[in-house]
Amino acid sequence: MKVSLFITCLSDVFFPQVGKSVVEIMNQCGVELDFPEGQTCCGQPAYNSGYQEDAKLAAKQMIKAFEHSEYIVTPSGSCASMVHHYYKEMFKGDSEWYEKAVHLADRTYELTDFLVNILGKNDWKSKLVEKAVFHQSCHMSRALGIKEEPLKLLSQVEGLDIKELPYCQDCCGFGGTFAVKMSSISETMVDEKIKHIEATEANLLIGADMGCLMNIGGRLRRENKNIQVLHVAEVLAKGLNK
C-alpha cells in the first residue's frame, strides 16, 4: 500500500515531531510513505476569512500535488475536513475542478480514521505510562464524525490511563482566525477547557488537531500548569516495538 503524507502548515512549522511520529507509525504498519513536495496550505485560513479566490488557488495546488496519490493521510482533522467539505463547496459550478476535488476528498483520511478503518489496527503496540485526557476537536468530531477512532487506538497503549474529560464536546476557543478576531471570547473558552482538564487530575492532554494543541498548550504554559500536551501520533509512536 502506498500513502502520501499531507503534513499541514502547523505540523511543518510548529509541530515537526508530529510529522516524524506519523512516519514512524506508517513504517510500523508496513506502509510505503511518500511526501509530495508540491503540497501547500489547504487554504482554510483564507477560506474562513472570506478570501475565496486565494483559497481556490491553494486548493488547486493541493489537488495537483496529490493527483497521483493512492491514499492521502494527514494528522489533522481540521485540514481533512477542509478537503472533504469545503473544496467541493468552492468548486460548485466548475465541473472540471469539482470532480478533481471530489477525487481528492475520496482519498484523504485523518490519521486515526486511516489506522482504524482502512488498516484495521486493533493491536497497537506502544507504551506510555500516564494519566491522560483526550480533547475532541470540533472539525474532527463534528464535521468528519471521527470520535471513537482515536480513543480506540489510545486504549491499546500500554500504561495509558484515559480519564473522561468533562464537557469534552466544547470547543477550546481556537477556531483558526476566530482566536484572533474574537480573542476575549477565545480566552474565556480555553480557560474553561483548562478547568475541565484540571478537574480530571490528568498530567497529559492528548489531541488530534494541532491548532487545538497550540491554543490549549500555550495557555497551559502561560499559566505555568504542569500538564504535558501531545498529539495522538506522538503517543502512538511512544515505545513502539521497532
From Swiss-Prot:
Is involved in L-lactate degradation and allows cells to grow with lactate as the sole carbon source. It comes from the Bacteria. It holds the Pfam family CCG. One of its GO terms (cellular component) is cytosol. It comes from Bacillus cereus (strain AH820). This is Lactate utilization protein A 2. Belongs to the LutA/YkgE family. GO terms for biological process: lactate metabolic process. GO terms for molecular function: oxidoreductase activity.
